[in-house]
Design a protein with these regions (language model features):
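Extreme N-terminal tail/first-helix region
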Residues: 1-15
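A structural motif detector for beta-strand N-caps
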Residues: 11, 16-19, 23, 29, ...
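A contiguous binding-surface segment within folded domains or other stable secondary-structure elements
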Residues: 66-75
Length: 75
């Protein structure tokens, strides 16, 4: 998996979460317990934060990118 920190902010991943090797987690992203991020998924928390809660599944090829106009993404 690709983990990209920026300005001291690094994605946070619960130890029980599954992250597929081909996924990208960028800057302010948090993955909750027992959650899974599947193949070729991109979570871009470079503008606002992304919080994937506990027991959540983000499927193959998903792209989640928060906008500064709409606030953070929480699931």
């Amino acid at each position: 998996m690709l983990i990209i920190p920026y300005k001291g902010v690094t994605p946070r991943i619960d130890k029980s979460a599954y992250i597929a090797e081909s996924s990208s987690l960028i800057v302010d992203v948090e993955i909750g317990s027992n959650s899974s991020i599947w193949f070729n998924t991109v979570l871009r928390g470079d503008v606002e934060s992304i919080n994937i809660g506990n027991n959540t599944n983000v499927q193959d090829g998903s792209v989640i990118h928060a906008s500064r106009f709409n606030g953070p993404v929480e699931q």
